[in-house]
């Protein structure tokens, strides 16, 4: 993987096209690497109108939610003439990676592009691998166009990450790279971190349901399986104060497996990382919840809002029996790019702040600095930084 990045950095488009031909069996040129307006129009003709409508409805909710996250620059003028503040500036450019293959995830396109757009990022570059014919999944193109991508390129894998991080003749370097991908994409993002910013290294999907005897076992089982179907490394955990509920959920799971299309993946996922844990008290259950710090947490108990106040660690919290996890994946509005592998203890969901940088503002008048210049000089001298002290002192040499 590092070799791919090194070649992209050294050879640019030449290496990018070679790796695309090698891995995606698609020959690209400078004239065909970027998705055209005609290709976007053609994508709309291939996508059902019902899906386009749903994408637009979801987009409204996602945009509305992220608009509430925006923060303005602020300034604080003090009586002595001092002005302190914080200037908010959107990143100039962002790269969004979208997986290709047989599966299309337009929801992921929306979740990664919308917060960048709301933040004010002017250049949003999406990359996604093409098929052998040099085409991109139509639903992916429709979602990208609706969300506001400014450039779309037909490249994927570690080579696409390298192009975004270092730039090539066809693709300009960006300031930050976001979006999910396979292990090679994840490792490539990790390798270029520091040269550009990245969102996170996402792990397998996780769900934890905290439930008591008021929960509907039919619903709980369905929600656990909604994440177990992602892949064999996904985790699905029920923490409950009711032994009876745990037994009923197990029965419901066995019934669902007989009719779900991805039953084989689900069975392996549950075998690897599926658990039903019984706690004696709700407080004990909450200790487990906070220790695991799941990507998705559902609270299905009596007084769920009260229980929610005791949760310290979770990526997204779904409250009540009708707030099923897929609601957050597709439609509610909060971002579905969430911390995994216990990182919800210190990381947050993807949000507008991820696409903004903050600059501190400091202004002192002569009188304001004069009042405290001796204090600064004392500090600097104590640290042995005489040039620091001199930088302040020279302004008052004649006084």
Regions found by a protein language model. Name each.
Residues 1-92:
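N-terminal Rossmann-like NAD(P)+-binding subdomain of aldehyde/semialdehyde dehydrogenases
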Residues 122-131, 236-242, 249, 320:
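Short internal beta-strands
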Residues 230, 238-314:
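A glycine- and small/hydrophobic-rich beta-loop-beta segment
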């Amino acid at each position: 993987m590092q070799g791919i990045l090194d070649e992209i950095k050294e050879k640019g488009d030449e290496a990018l096209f070679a790796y695309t031909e090698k891995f995606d069996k698609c020959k690209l040129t400078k004239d065909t690497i970027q998705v055209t307006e005609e290709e976007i129009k053609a994508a709309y003709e291939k996508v059902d109108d019902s899906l386009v409508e749903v994408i637009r409805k979801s987009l409204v909710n996602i945009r509305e939610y992220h608009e509430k996250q925006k923060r303005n620059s602020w300034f604080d003028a003090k009586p002595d003439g001092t002005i302190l503040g914080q200037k908010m500036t959107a990143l100039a450019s962002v790269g969004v990676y979208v997986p290709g293959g047989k599966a299309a995830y337009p929801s992921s396109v929306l979740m990664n592009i919308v917060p960048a757009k709301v933040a004010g990022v002017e250049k949003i570059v999406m990359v996604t691998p093409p098929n052998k014919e040099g085409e991109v999944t139509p639903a992916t193109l429709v979602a990208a166009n609706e969300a506001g991508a400014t450039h779309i390129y037909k490249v994927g894998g570690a080579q696409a990450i390298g192009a975004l991080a270092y730039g090539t003749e066809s693709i300009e370097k960006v300031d930050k790279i976001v979006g999910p991908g396979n292990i090679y994409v994840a490792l490539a993002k990790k390798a270029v971190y520091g040269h550009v910013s990245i969102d996170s290294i996402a792990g397998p999907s996780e769900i934890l349901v905290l439930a008591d005897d008021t929960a509907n076992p039919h619903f709980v089982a369905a929600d656990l399986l909604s994440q177990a179907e992602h892949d064999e490394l996904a985790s699905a955990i029920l923490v409950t104060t009711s032994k009876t509920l745990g037994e009923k959920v197990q029965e419901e799971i066995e019934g669902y497996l007989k009719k779900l299309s991805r039953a084989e993946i689900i069975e392996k996922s549950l075998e690897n990382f599926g658990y039903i844990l019984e706690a004696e008290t709700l407080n004990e259950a909450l200790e487990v919840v906070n220790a695991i710090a799941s990507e998705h947490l559902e609270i299905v108990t009596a007084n769920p809002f009260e229980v929610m106040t005791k949760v310290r660690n979770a990526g997204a919290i779904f409250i009540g029996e009708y707030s099923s996890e897929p609601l957050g994946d597709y439609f509610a509005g909060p971002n579905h790019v969430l911390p995994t592998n216990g990182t919800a203890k210190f990381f947050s969901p993807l949000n507008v702040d991820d696409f903004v940088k903050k600059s501190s503002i400091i202004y002192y008048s002569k009188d304001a600095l004069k009042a405290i210049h001796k204090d600064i000089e004392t500090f600097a001298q104590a640290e042995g930084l005489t040039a620091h002290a001199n930088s302040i002192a020279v302004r008052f040499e004649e006084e």
